[in-house]
Amino acid sequence: MREVFTMWRHTQMVVLVALTAAIYAATLIPTQFLPIIPGFTNVRPANVFPFVFGLLFGPAGAWGAAVGNLINDFFGTLGLGSIGGFVGNFFLGFLPYKMWSSFFRRGEDIEPNLASRKKLVVFLAIVVLASAVCAVWIAWWNDLLGFVPFAALAAVITVNNALAGLVLGPIFMVLLYPRIRRWGLLWTEIM
């Protein structure tokens, strides 16, 4: 967890936060007009990015997801619920890189690529788990504030997040991983 704070000492990681936030916000904003629960969540195919950027860029991907979601909220859903969205989206990017290595034994190849069936299954499992954690946090916060019932919001956000990651995640990982690695931008190479 320390890397979440120490990453700010690395210029490349700070740039990756800005890049990730910009890409996430720029792809979230156009779907603001497709609400599922008006004022709280909408159809979000862009939710693929926290999983992919979290796994590739580590803590920079997590911070980028949080900031990108907050920027998106300025375009129609900004309010006290945005605090829950900030934290929930942080975890959407944080959990993929934190959980990835826990699925592999010592000495096993833990490169964040989907080059084996096991890695694909692990990626898909992480997408579902991170989606649920994000949804629980956001739904709990909004229920605490009295905005939306927990069960309804948690179910919608979990499915919405997971669908984007399950369908688009493997495609983006296969396309981006080789390039990110070649450019030396994997978080494990920077920090």
Protein language model annotation of sequence segments:
Residues 2-63:
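Hydrophobic transmembrane alpha-helices
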Residues 62-72:
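Central hydrophobic cores of alpha-helical transmembrane segments
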Residues 29-48, 71-191:
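Membrane-embedded alpha-helical hairpins and interfacial helices in multi-pass inner-membrane proteins
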